Amino acid sequence: EIEQAKQDIDIRTFRQEFEGTFENYAGAVYYNFHPVDNVVKRQIDWTKPLHIGMDFNVDPMSACVSQIEKDKVYFVDEVIIYGSNTDEMVQEIRDRYGTKMQIFIYPDPASKQRKTSAGGRTDLSILQNAGFKVKVKHKHPAIRDRVNAVNSRLKDSKGERHIFVSQSCKTLIKGLQRQIYKENTNIPDKEDGFDHMNDALGYMIDYLKPLTTQANFSSPTRWTMK
């Protein structure tokens, strides 16, 4: 299990979880993001499915749009709508990408109960009724686990990167660069608004390639659909 963990997680997370070292949380939440090595020129391939992470904060509602190739994920677009609801997000996605592409949505697990639109419908049911393939966990992952999952895909222990962001996704890039921890805590700061797109990305990555602080890595999840 330890050898598998070395392959699946980044060095800092490995030291913290397996060697019992104290890791200072000061500074950037997504410390493995590099504005050159993780940023690429990339456009949507209209022949391949879309994988969209989604955060349901209504101001703004945020979605990061990606495509997966083998063990790498490329974020190629982002959707940001202020003062919005799930119906409007669905319409925007359909307007941008049409109805012919296969679309997977990875929303906030709170979507099972949360209702940002009228009519008593949950956010999850709206996405499902729109024809999207919705992939969601039964409950929220620990914030620490979700952040570790993202950092371990931004750069793993071998120095390999598995998450890439198109230059056009300026909000996502800014968020990954600038979100920091609250002083003297391991809680990501949400005051500056960098959290929404980061959370959207995190829900998707945590679903596809989860890590846990219990480090149960004997059967790692690859970039495949459950």
Q: Positions of the model-derived regions?
A:
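Mg2+-dependent endonuclease catalytic cores in nucleic-acid-processing enzymes, primarily RNase H-like
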Residues: 64, 70-188, 211-212, 222-226
